[in-house]
């Protein structure tokens, strides 16, 4: 069966296609396992395992117990494995199959390589207060002169959010704060005449997102700090013309296959 096709499925001619079923013959499996030590200072925290990219799916086991399943070859998968861990050594194992039912949706002009393609790692966070997700959407206003950051932060627990924007040289540009209560906090940051991002000068700022909670004595306890790279740009289509920051751009290109 081909590892690359630009038309049709990789199993064509060898399988009576009946979605969402996939072939059992030649549906090869990769098995991975690693013994790890959980640091002592992670005790009491939520431990999450992150897989940047696994093709085509992943069955995860921790210390012999099933801990989760995911499928989507180019989207990260994260699992809370706290309930399955013990003190000392822990066995993390997972299997990934060449095809799954999601492979029907991934029929593209692409190399069909199975396995682990991006970084995999563990991280720990406060179980009661942590940043679950963040979306930063940049925009340009005032005839593409000034910048706006529309920030949506999803938080577990109740805490204070602090946002600090730094330029490429590490100089503080602007700040904002917000209060998150078991849900989503929406913040808008305005930046006067920022460096603009484009293909020729891809200037990036760093948005530092800090989450903290108040102690009984009135002091603040830091729960997490997350850096996010952001660039100020505006992409539009006007009068059948593709524009970046108000300037027309002609795009020429082809697929980039993620092989590295």
Residue ranges, per PLM feature:
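Short acidic/polar inter-strand loop motif in beta-rich domains
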Residues: 98-104, 213-216, 222-223
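Beta-strand-rich binding/interaction modules
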Residues: 60-62, 146-178, 185-187
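Short glycine/proline/serine/threonine-rich loop/turn segments at secondary-structure transition edges
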Residues: 42-45, 85-89, 191-204
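Surface beta-strand/loop "capping" patches
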Residues: 127-157
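Accessory beta-strand-rich segments of carbohydrate-active enzymes
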Residues: 22, 27-132, 157-158, 162, ...
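Aromatic sugar-binding surface patches on proteins
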Residues: 75-77, 182-191
């Amino acid at each position: 069966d081909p590892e690359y096709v630009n038309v049709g499925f990789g199993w064509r001619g060898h399988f009576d296609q009946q979605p969402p079923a996939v072939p059992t013959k030649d549906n090869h499996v990769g098995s991975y396992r690693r013994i790890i030590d959980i640091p002592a200072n992670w005790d009491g925290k939520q431990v999450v395992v992150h897989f940047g990219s696994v093709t085509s799916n992943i069955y995860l086991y921790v210390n012999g117990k099933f801990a989760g399943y995911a499928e989507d070859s180019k989207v990260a998968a994260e699992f809370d494995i706290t309930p399955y861990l013990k003190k000392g050594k822990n066995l993390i194992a997972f299997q990934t199959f060449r095809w799954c039912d999601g492979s029907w949706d991934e029929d593209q002009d692409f190399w069909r390589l199975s396995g682990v393609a991006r970084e995999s790692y563990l991280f720990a966070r406060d179980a009661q207060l942590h940043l679950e997700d963040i979306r930063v959407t940049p925009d340009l206003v005032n005839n593409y002169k000034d910048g706006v950051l529309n920030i949506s932060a999803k938080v577990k627990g109740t805490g204070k959010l602090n946002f600090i924007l730094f330029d490429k040289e590490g100089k503080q540009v602007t700040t904002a704060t917000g209060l998150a209560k078991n849900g989503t906090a929406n913040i808008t940051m305005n930046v006067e005449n920022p460096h603009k991002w484009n293909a020729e000068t891809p200037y990036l700022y760093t948005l530092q997102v800090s989450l903290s909670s108040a102690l009984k004595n009135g002091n603040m306890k830091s729960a997490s700090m997350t850096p996010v790279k952001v660039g100020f740009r505006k992409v539009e289509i006007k009068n059948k013309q593709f524009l970046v920051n108000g300037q027309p751009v002609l795009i020429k290109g082809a697929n980039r296959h993620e092989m590295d």
